From Swiss-Prot:
Superkingdom of origin organism: Eukaryota
Glycoprotein found in the keyword field: yes
GO molecular function: G protein-coupled receptor activity; odorant binding; olfactory receptor activity
Tissue expression notes: Expression restricted to nervous system and testis. Is also detected in several tumors types, most notably prostate cancer.
Principal localisation: membrane
Regions crossing the membrane: 52-72, 86-106, 131-151, 166-186, 215-235, 262-282, 300-322
This protein's name: Probable G-protein coupled receptor 148
Species of origin: Homo sapiens (Human)
Gene Ontology cellular component list: membrane; plasma membrane
GN (gene name): GPR148
Glycosylation sites: 34
Length: 347
C-alpha cells in the first residue's frame, strides 16, 4: 500500500481511544471485500498521520513525569488522603494515569502492527471507558464538594467526614466500571459484525457511524454521551452558583483570590475534557448524515484521540501544583535542590 492507510472497519467501536491507522496491518478478507461498509476509499497518507503521534508522545511524557509523583505524595500522607479536596484530585490523577497507560499500549500495538485477541480488545475497551468515566465523575464530585462548602457550609461540616471521601471514590469507580461495561458489552452482543472480523484491535471513536451498525450500538454510546453532558450541565450550574456567592460576599473582587484561582483552573480543565466529547458528537452527526468525507472523519478521530484527549491530562498535574502550595512543597521535597528554582506557585 506504500504510503497510504486502509484501516479495517470494526463493527463495535468505542470512544475515547486511539485509531488504529497502520499501513502494515492487513485487513481481513471479509472486510476488504465488503464494499457496503463504505470505507474502502479511506486512504490517508501515513507519513502525515504519524505526525499526530509526536504531540501525543510529548503530552504523555509530560504527564508521566510528574503525575505519579504527585499521586504518591497525596496517598502517602495520611492527612492529605483524608481530605476530599486532595483525595478527589488524586482519583483524577489515577484515572488519567490508567488512560495514559492504556493509550500507550494501544499506540504500541498499532505502530507495531500487533494483533490483540478479542478478549484483550474487550478488556481494553471497558478499561478505557471506565477511566474516562471516572475522570468526569471525579470532576463532578469536586465541584459538588466545593459547592457544598461555599453555599451550604453548615451542611458541609455535618456531611463531610473522613470516610465520606473514600466512599465517594468507591462509588465513582463502581459506577465507572459497571455503567459503561454493561452498555458496551450489550452493544457487542447485539452487533453481529463483531463475529465477522478478525482479531485486530481497532478502537476508532466513531460511535457506530459506519453503515450497518445496529440501533442498540447507537443507543449505547448516545446514553454515555448524555451522562457526560448531564454531568457538564451540573458542573456549569454549580460553578455559576459558586461564582455568584463569591462575588456577593466580596471574595471575588479581592485581587487574586484562592476562590478565583480554583474556579479558573477547574473551568479550563473541565472545558478541555468536555471538548473531546463535543468533537466526538459533532463527528458522529456529520459522518452519519454524510456532511464530511471519510478523510475528514479520520482526521477528526485521530486529532481528537491523539491531541485533545491527551492535552488536559498533561495540564492537570501542573495546574494543581500551581494551585496547592502545600502539595507543591511536598513534591519539591522529593526533587533535587538544584531543581527547586524551576518550580514556582501562583497561589
Amino acid at each position: 500500500m506504500g504510503d497510504e492507510l486502509a484501516p479495517c472497519p470494526v463493527g463495535t467501536t468505542a470512544w475515547p481511544a486511539l485509531i488504529q491507522l497502520i499501513s502494515k496491518t492487513p485487513c481481513m478478507p471479509q472486510a476488504a471485500s465488503n464494499t457496503s461498509l463504505g470505507l474502502g476509499d479511506l486512504r490517508v497518507p501515513s507519513s502525515m498521520l504519524y505526525w499526530l503521534f509526536l504531540p501525543s508522545s510529548l503530552l504523555a511524557a509530560a504527564t508521566l513525569a510528574v503525575s505519579p509523583l504527585l499521586l504518591v505524595t497525596i496517598l502517602r500522607n495520611q492527612r492529605l488522603r483524608q481530605e476530599p479536596h486532595y483525595l478527589l484530585p488524586a482519583n483524577i490523577l489515577l484515572s488519567d494515569l490508567a488512560y495514559i497507560l492504556l493509550h500507550m499500549l494501544i499506540s504500541s500495538s498499532s505502530l507495531g502492527g500487533w494483533e490483540l485477541g478479542r478478549m484483550a480488545c474487550g478488556i481494553l475497551t471497558d478499561a478505557v471507558f471506565a477511566a474516562c468515566t471516572s475522570t468526569i465523575l471525579s470532576f463532578t464530585a469536586i465541584v459538588l464538594h466545593t459547592y457544598l462548602a461555599v453555599i451550604h457550609p453548615l451542611r458541609y461540616l455535618s456531611f463531610m467526614s473522613h470516610g465520606a471521601a473514600w466512599k465517594a471514590v468507591a462509588l465513582i469507580w463502581l459506577v465507572a466500571c459497571c455503567f459503561p461495561t454493561f452498555l458496551i458489552w450489550l452493544s457487542k452482543w447485539q452487533d453481529a459484525q463483531l463475529e465477522e472480523q478478525g482479531a485486530s484491535y481497532i478502537l476508532p471513536p466513531s460511535m457506530g457511524t459506519q453503515p450497518g451498525c445496529g440501533l442498540l450500538v447507537i443507543v449505547t454510546y448516545t446514553s454515555i454521551l448524555c451522562v457526560l453532558f448531564l454531568c457538564t450541565a451540573l458542573i456549569a450550574n454549580c460553578f455559576w452558583r459558586i461564582y455568584a456567592e463569591a462575588k456577593t460576599s466580596g471574595i471575588w473582587g479581592q485581587g487574586y483570590s484562592r476562590a478565583r484561582g480554583t474556579l479558573l483552573i477547574h473551568s479550563v480543565l473541565i472545558t478541555l475534557y468536555v471538548s473531546t466529547g463535543v468533537v466526538f458528537s459533532l463527528d458522529m452527526v456529520l459522518t452519519r448524515y454524510h456532511h464530511i468525507d471519510s478523510g475528514t472523519h479520520t482526521w477528526l478521530l485521530a486529532a481528537n484521540s491523539e491531541v485533545l484527549m491527551m492535552l488536559p491530562r498533561a495540564m492537570l498535574t501542573y495546574l494543581y501544583l500551581l494551585r496547592y502550595r502545600q502539595l507543591l512543597g511536598m513534591v519539591r521535597g522529593h526533587l533535587p535542590s538544584r531543581r527547586h528554582q524551576a518550580i514556582f506557585t501562583i497561589s
